[in-house]
Design a protein with these regions (language model features):
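A residue-level signal for conserved active-site and pocket-lining positions in enzyme catalytic cores
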Residues: 14, 77, 135
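Short amphipathic alpha-helical interaction segments
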Residues: 19-30
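N-terminal alpha-helical segment
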Residues: 6, 55-56, 131
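Single conserved hydrophobic/aromatic residue that forms the stacking wall/gate
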Residues: 1-10, 14
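Short gly/ser-rich loop at a beta-strand->alpha-helix junction or flexible surface loop bordering the NTP-binding
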Residues: 29-118, 226-229
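Hydrophobic alpha-helical interaction segments
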Residues: 120-250
């Protein structure tokens, strides 16, 4: 029965039940009343631990199970891999399904558009963007998510990246400005990642011809001719200067 199913599968979310819809709704109601399950969102329930009175699923497990194609992305993906400089009370979920941002158990679940051919890996019971995909996505969207300083800090915690996979992510995005940004970021972080000259040549070839600004209202901007980019003299220097996490634009 449903109760036994819950007890045997403590790491599973309850989406559907057995029997008629009426019977299923009644069972769910009874389990909610007893505090055995909680509603996360419509048609999505999570088992509650009798010992801790907390959901048995982590925020990342919940997020990656919201829909069949859902996966954890951006700063939340850094957190899954253990490279989050800070823990946010937000969980970024990429999916083709539309949903309104919602809060459950003190965490705000935010919808992110799932890009075609996004590279997804399985980390335990969590579907999450690969480390390379996470870094490229975070560089692309730092003005919307986390801010440039936090992205830099997270990247500095990453022990290494596969440069070919980074290039594959860039090719899938097919965005000249993103090539400029990534060329600049990885050149500034060459000490950490040791990418080859071929990587930077590919970024140069993919870059837009337009001169762009990495950040707004920065007094430290200089023109980086190779990337046609107005950006700080030192990217890592931003950490010491304490740039506001959201005072940036892409």
């Amino acid at each position: 029965d449903l109760h036994l199913s819950i007890r045997r599968q403590r790491q599973m979310c309850i989406r559907d039940s057995v029997g008629t819809a009426t019977a299923a709704n009644q069972v769910i109601y009874e389990y909610q009343k007893k505090g055995l399950i909680e509603k996360v969102k419509r048609d999505f329930y999570v088992v509650i631990s009798m010992e801790t009175k907390q959901p048995v699923l982590s925020r990342y497990q919940i997020g990656s199970n919201l829909f069949p194609d859902a996966c954890i992305t951006h700063h939340s993906a850094f957190e899954v891999f253990g490279y989050g400089s800070q823990v946010f009370y937000e969980c970024y979920v990429a999916t083709d399904k539309r949903f309104h941002d919602f809060e459950y158990d003190g965490v705000l679940y935010r919808h992110i558009e799932r890009k075609p051919d996004m590279e997804v890996v399985q980390q335990g019971k969590i579907r999450v963007t690969s480390m390379e995909q996470t870094v490229v996505d975070s560089i692309r969207d730092f003005e919307k998510i986390a801010g440039i300083e936090e992205v830099i800090r997270c990247m500095m915690l990453v022990p290494g990246l596969n440069e070919q996979k980074v290039l594959e992510c860039l090719a899938r995005n097919n965005n000249g400005f993103l090539y400029q940004k990534c060329g600049y970021f990885f050149e500034e972080m060459q000490e950490e990642f040791h990418f080859s000259a071929k990587f930077f040549e590919t970024c140069e070839n993919g870059s837009s011809d337009a001169k762009r600004y990495l950040m707004k209202e920065s007094q430290d901007n200089v023109f980086h001719k190779r990337w046609k980019l107005y950006a700080p003299v030192s990217l890592k220097g931003l950490i010491d200067k304490g740039v506001d996490a959201y005072d940036a634009m892409g």
